[in-house]
């Protein structure tokens, strides 16, 4: 499971899921909630993400934090 917080801008879910797809990670479940300018995502993956995926997600513009739980 990955949790992310990001600025609530159009296209952010697409950017996040593209990183996961490019790294051959399958999303089992995903929840996206927003409050004002901030969005919070909980993404359940089929397999544990490699560290490089967390780094790639963190490097995306408008991502505030990324955590594996």
Residues of each region from the PLM?
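A conserved regulatory-domain signal marking ACT and ACT-like small-molecule sensing domains
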Residues: 1-69
């Amino acid at each position: 499971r990955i949790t992310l917080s990001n600025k609530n801008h159009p296209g952010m879910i697409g950017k996040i899921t593209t990183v996961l797809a490019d790294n051959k990670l399958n999303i089992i479940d995903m929840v996206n909630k927003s409050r004002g300018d901030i969005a919070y995502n909980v993404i359940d993956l089929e397999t544990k993400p490699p560290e490089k995926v967390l780094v790639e997600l963190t490097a995306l513009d408008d991502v505030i934090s990324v955590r594996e739980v």
